[in-house]
Amino acid sequence: MSDTPQQDTATPAWGTRRGPTVPYIPGLDGLRAIAVLSVIVYHADPRWLGGGFLGVEVFFVISGYLITLLLVAERERTGTVTLSHFWVRRARRLLPALWTLLTGVGLWCVLFDRDRLGMLRGDAIAGFLYVSNWFQVWTGSSYTSSFAFAPLRHLWSLAVEEQYYIIWPVVMFVLLRRLRRSTLPLLAVWFTALAVVVAGLTAWMYHPGVIGTFAETPDQYMTLFGRHVLRTDFLYLGTLSRSSGLLLGAALAMVWRPWALVRRGMQRATVLFDALGTAAIAALGWTFWVFRDVVRGETEHAYDLLYRGGFLIVGVASVIAIMAVTKPRSVLGRYVVGNPLFVWIGTRSYGLYLYHWAVFQAHRKTAGTPLTVKEFVGLMIITLALTELSYRFIEYPVRMGVLGRAWSRWRDPRSLQDIAFRRRVSVASVVVILLPVVVAVSMAGAQVKPDDITANLDNNEDAVVTIPTIGPRPTTAPGEKWHHRGVAFTP
């Protein structure tokens, strides 16, 4: 990121700004690294970092900020927002690794675990269509169930983001077309207010208490298109209820654009912002630790804090951290959070998030089984290898337009080398096409073979969870079992 981007003293018209669309900001990759590592550690064993699931909220804020920043930058530079170009860029960025994951998980089950192939069908279709969050809400199937085989259910957060990527550019296209550039700060106020409203609605809809069947605890359910679904499922997985972080990031993009941070007063405040950013990152670490009570259920108000302001606290801390690391000449952003290791992890955070959960599941078979340190290290080596291979040979080449160039060379060979290249590409294309087809056909014909525990959970047997209330905590009878059936605690 340049230390001295240009800023006009007056407010220029749309389409008059020169320069790069959005400069590269290593500090943001550093924040991504912190977020994805917290999630991975939590997934390995919640006892290690019980609030690590909140790293997903950090991702939401970063995504809201960057996507809105890209849209505003395009409007400032060209005078318009080309939606088709935006969506093509997002598809190049997200789809290759996702399709690789879906094919790989399906192929693993075809070869080594056919009995579970049928159980993947719904998750695979939902993941492919980016509706995993609503699929889990609708079916009541979350991967927090300690006994679930769910190698694809972590895709719910990507579904939330992709739905945002579809809707938000249209919203911004309309707003930026109708409003003047000078009204961007007002939009920031509106978006912040909407984020607070979403947090307020989440707090209002949340009900503490015991969760059982609908007949036993009807207050813990809500009606969605005629179907009774858990409130905690809806609030944790729902696109609207999880939009507060995305909105906070969007609000920040209205007033905190890297190319507009050249004023001398802002430069002199570098030390102050570094201090605030350090405090914000420390606050995130504190939430990652203190929210372990949400998983353990050791305090009376743990769940209340999560749904009654917890997500908003994480969102605000994330906003402050983003402000600090994106500020020109930020020591925190360039050298601390933006150190080479964190940048390397951050640039591959998408692949790390995609592959780590599937690798963990392939080893332990069930979601709730904690990993030992030795298992964790071994599985992370595999995850890092898969992530790097995916990044170097699938994700990055597609983003850089390699497929388009290969297609042009294949369609119009002009030398013997091009002809040989055409043959190699043809063979590779057949393999790439056949693998997902084989997986899809096998999955379509597979029978669902749930184990006894899954069948019991589907019948709402032995599927009660205690959510602490403001008053005394409910207690269980001697020998009674409690299972986390909702998704309130897992990203």
Where are the regions that the model predicts?
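Hydrophobic membrane-embedded alpha-helices
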Residues: 5-7, 12-18, 23-28, 34-450
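Membrane-interface segments at or immediately adjacent to transmembrane helices
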Residues: 433-490
